[in-house]
From Swiss-Prot:
Ranges for region Disordered: 206-258
A single GO BP: DNA replication
Subcellular location: Nucleus; Cytoplasm
Other observations noted: Recognized by antibodies directed against the RecA protein.
Originating species: Mus musculus (Mouse)
Modified residues (N6,N6,N6-trimethyllysine): 135
Tissue-specificity statement: Highly expressed in transformed mouse AtT20 neuroendocrine cells. Expressed at a lower level in testis, kidney, skeletal muscle, liver, lung, spleen, brain and heart and kidney. In testis, expressed at much higher levels in proliferating cells than in differentiating cells. Not detected in embryo.
Function: Involved in DNA replication and the cellular response to DNA damage. May participate in DNA replication factories and create a bridge between DNA replication and repair mediated by high molecular weight complexes. May play a role in illegitimate recombination and regulation of gene expression. May participate in mRNA processing. Binds, in vitro, to double-stranded DNA. Also shown to bind preferentially to curved DNA in vitro and in vivo. Binds via its C-terminal domain to RNA in vitro.
Domain note: The C-terminal domain (268-393) is organized into 2 subdomains that bear structural similarities to SH3-like domains. Both subdomains adopt a similar 5-stranded beta-barrel-like fold and are connected to each other by a short linker of 5 residues. The 5 beta-sheets are packed at approximately right angles against each other. A highly conserved groove formed at the interface between the 2 subdomains, comprised of Lys residues 302 and 391 and other positively charged residues, may possibly be the site of RNA-binding.
Ranges for region C-terminal subdomain B: 338-389
One Pfam family recorded for the sequence: C2H2-zf_KIN17
Keywords: Coiled coil, Cytoplasm, DNA damage, DNA recombination, DNA repair, DNA replication, DNA-binding, Metal-binding, Methylation, mRNA processing, Nucleus, RNA-binding, Stress response, Zinc, Zinc-finger
Name of this protein: DNA/RNA-binding protein KIN17
Length: 391
């Protein structure tokens, strides 16, 4: 019987079978060969190439098992990290997706006999969080990427700094209130009983300066105060007001108010605050990655849109192409002196300015703020990565 034609149903079926997954028991991990049926697998086991691979493996079987185990672990964790991230997922779901790849490492070639043993091993090694439920074992990937850990530490540091600033502000306000209360002498009124020797005599009140706030009831034959006493009382009250106004005006000149000091603290905090996301719409950036080819390497473009703080849609200036890039693949562009720039980080973030000069040795620049409440302020020593040219 002749060989089947290329477009015959049998040939087409054979090509479809060769591309798909076959039975696990007919796969040889040492030779990395998949057989279609039992007869083919038997013939492969009797072949010279298979016998040669078995001789090599028999010399150092532990080395081959360690190699397959490491490859299986790396591929499994890479799939778990990329596909599911840090979500809690059933281990069988991840395994089924892993074995759907035709060139995967089979578990029977590794040091783990079952998926449960492999799951427990991941938990013991601290690579994943594992827990057993009535429905089976669940795993959760632990992200130990240095970049992710750095971002988490920066976020925790920023939260701690905000809490410290709030505590300092509250403590400062309490201190100001305490100082204000200490400056005032709390007067306690003294009460005395009214004594009258003669019921027919009229009662008068002595309002002299030496009375000190206590009303002493005395008996006298006079029925009213004379005009001289009223003048004395008015002059004494006016003198007190002048003294109190002068004494309150002097510390106001020496000390700043609580509101002014709080505003200075907030301005200082904003000036020193930095973020890891610096992309802003409307700035000119340069592509520094070579993954896109030489066509876009070292080429400039304008940021049209910022997605999730760290991704930008860049329109190339020469070709007009639109590319979606991460900020790690971009860098800022420093224009010539006299051109307009945008501050991307630090206390002046979001303000536009004019580039005055460049210090090439210190990799810094001097700009003049053109917008906002700090318009006209001259800022020295601002880093290259904190400013970029405006489109």
């Amino acid at each position: 019987m002749g060989k089947s034609d290329f477009l015959s149903p049998k040939a087409i079926a054979n090509r479809i079978k060769s591309k798909g997954l076959q039975k696990l028991r007919w796969y040889c991990q040492m030779c990395q060969k998949q057989c279609r049926d039992e007869n083919g697998f038997k013939c492969h086991c009797m072949s010279e190439s298979h016998q040669r691979q078995l001789l090599l493996a028999s010399e150092n079987p532990q080395q081959f098992m360690d190699y397959f185990s490491e490859e299986f672990r790396n591929d499994f964790l890479e799939l778990l990290r990329r596909r599911f991230g840090t979500k809690r997922v059933h281990n069988n779901i991840v395994y089924n997706e892993y074995i759907s790849h035709r060139e995967h490492i089979h578990m029977n070639a590794t040091q783990w006999e079952t998926l449960t043993d492999f799951t427990k091993w991941l938990g013991r090694e601290g690579l994943c969080k594992v827990d057993e439920t009535p429905k089976g074992w669940y795993i959760q990937y632990i992200d130990r990427d240095p970049e992710t850990i750095r971002r988490q530490l920066e976020l925790e540091k920023k939260k701690k700094q905000d809490l410290d600033d709030e505590e300092k502000t509250a403590k400062f306000i309490e201190e100001q209130v305490r100082r204000g209360l200490e400056g005032k002498e709390q007067e306690t009124p003294v009460f005395t009983e009214l004594s009258r020797e003669n019921e027919e005599e009229k009662v008068t009140f002595n309002l002299n300066k030496g009375a000190g706030g206590s009303a002493g009831a005395t008996t006298s034959k006079s029925s009213s105060l004379g005009p001289s006493a009223l003048k004395l009382l008015g002059s004494a009250a006016s003198g007190k007001r002048k003294e109190s106004s002068q004494s309150s005006a002097q510390p106001a000149k020496k000390k700043k108010s609580a509101l002014d000091e709080i505003m200075e603290l907030e301005e200082e905090k904003k000036r020193t605050a930095r973020t890891d996301a610096w992309l802003q719409p409307g700035i000119v950036v340069k592509i520094i990655t070579k993954k896109l080819g030489e066509k876009y390497h070292k080429k400039k473009g304008v940021v049209k849109e910022v997605i999730d703080r760290y991704t930008a849609v860049v329109k190339m200036t020469d070709s007009g192409d639109r590319l979606k890039l991460d900020q790690t693949h971009l860098e800022t562009v420093i224009p010539a002196p006299g051109k307009r720039v945008l501050v991307l980080n630090g206390g002046y973030r979001g303000n536009e300015g004019t580039l005055e000069s460049i210090n090439e040795k210190a990799f810094s620049a001097t700009i003049v703020i053109e917008t906002g409440p700090l318009k006209g302020r001259r800022v020295e020593g601002i880093q290259y990565e904190d400013i970029s040219k405006l489109a």
